């Protein structure tokens, strides 16, 4: 990922927060035909496992990408945070000299590391329990894996494979108009903050916090 120093984010706690908030990742690995393979998959962070944390998830067994992941042994998980189109009309500089163009503000993290594909039924059961409990936790009446018949769950587990990606490298980028003069940054915050699109307002809030 192209990542100029001005936009680089290296703080582990910020990077981990982005992973948790994004939830859905694009998992990419080298393809056997020279074309990269990619799958959209929810991944859960275990921050206390490994130097930079470990990601867990699962794929449908019918998705042949898992075989490519097993063969490659390494993968990149791409997480997107808030993003927004930035109009030149937000800039004070537009009124001063007009030498402005559109851009896009966004937050992204790439997690790179060794990936393990596993099929053991006990590990898969523990994995889906952990993932389910995590995502059901905010609900007033959370669903649990044990709510379904045991034989049914066992049959469902046969249709998936587990993933474990131990993160070796975390690359973070927060492109939030840091390259613009202060008055232009204020204009972007005001412009995005008054948008009817919640995604725009999320970016404005990030810029407003300034960290």
Task: Give residue spans per PLM region.
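Binding-site signature for planar aromatic cofactors or substrates
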Residues: 1-211
